[in-house]
Amino acid sequence: MTDNFLSNSSQKQGRLSAWLTIHRLSHRPLGFDYQGVEIVEVRPEDWPSVAVSLYVYGFNYLRLQCGYDVFPGGPLASIYYLTKVQDGADQPEEVCIKIFVSRDNPKIPSAFWIWKSADFQERESYDMLGIIYESHPHLKRILMPESWLGWPLRKDYITPDFFELQDAY
């Protein structure tokens, strides 16, 4: 399943990226963050198989899921920080998975069925950015009212001229 998606990367391949390559899981290494955590890009269609493989490999804790708008009119990103929690591990192994989607069709398979802690985090990304997490059992707004129009954290979002403050007193 590794195709030219992996070969198009000029980044140094880390330990986890090498493991994903050995197991023929499509990905692209993006280097390391400032703390030395390996960053890997995965396509939305490859995310379910990569997520299950990472869980089986030992990444049993979803530390963080968030999303962001890369640039106005550009793609949206969903990020998953996974940790391998083990007994007596003072330096647990971590990985950052980035998934980029088009703002015209922002669909990513949900990680809820693997890491239950993805529930509220994916809902927040949906509420603020409009990323649709397919097969998520409770995908609805979590911070904004259900009647709210648009996605407030998108860079092309236009703030409404008027909105009603409810329960302000």
Swiss-Prot record:
Recorded catalytic activity of this chain's protein: a plastoquinone + NADH + (n+1) H(+)(in) = a plastoquinol + NAD(+) + n H(+)(out); a plastoquinone + NADPH + (n+1) H(+)(in) = a plastoquinol + NADP(+) + n H(+)(out)
Assigned EC number: 7.1.1.-
GO cellular component: a single term: chloroplast thylakoid membrane
Keywords from the named record: Chloroplast, Membrane, NAD, NADP, Plastid, Plastoquinone, Quinone, Thylakoid, Translocase, Transport
Localization in the cell: Plastid, Chloroplast thylakoid membrane
Gene Ontology biological-process entries: photosynthesis, light reaction
Gene Ontology terms for molecular function: NADH dehydrogenase (ubiquinone) activity; quinone binding
Membrane topology, from the record: Peripheral membrane protein
One family name in Pfam for this protein: Complex1_30kDa
Family indicated by similarity: Belongs to the complex I 30 kDa subunit family.
Self-association and partners: NDH is composed of at least 16 different subunits, 5 of which are encoded in the nucleus.
Function of the molecule: NDH shuttles electrons from NAD(P)H:plastoquinone, via FMN and iron-sulfur (Fe-S) centers, to quinones in the photosynthetic chain and possibly in a chloroplast respiratory chain. The immediate electron acceptor for the enzyme in this species is believed to be plastoquinone. Couples the redox reaction to proton translocation, and thus conserves the redox energy in a proton gradient.
Protein name: NAD(P)H-quinone oxidoreductase subunit J, chloroplastic
Gene: ndhJ
